[in-house]
Amino acid sequence: MLILSRKVNEGIVIDDNIHIKVISIDRGSVRLGFEAPESTLILRAELKEAIVSENQKASASVDESVLENIKKVIKP
């Protein structure tokens, strides 16, 4: 992991098209500003983890009876 120190109004550039700027630092909280192409997905880490967790739950909770019905419809 690369660790960089930045002050307010200083920034970081990633791949020439993603710009991250420190907007403010206040009582243990850092506000960051991001400039990136619209196609670039930017998420807070906890939101990304929640999405992954929900996707895993959704894929794991398949009703076995539904699978059996699908097997009956799709015969080899």
Swiss-Prot record:
An individual GO BP term: negative regulation of translational initiation
GO cellular component, one term: cytosol
Keyword line: Bacterial flagellum biogenesis, Cytoplasm, Repressor, RNA-binding, Translation regulation
Protein's cellular compartments: Cytoplasm
Family of the protein in this entry: Belongs to the CsrA/RsmA family.
PANTHER family linked: CARBON STORAGE REGULATOR
Protein name as it appears in the record: Translational regulator CsrA
Organism name: Helicobacter pylori (strain G27)
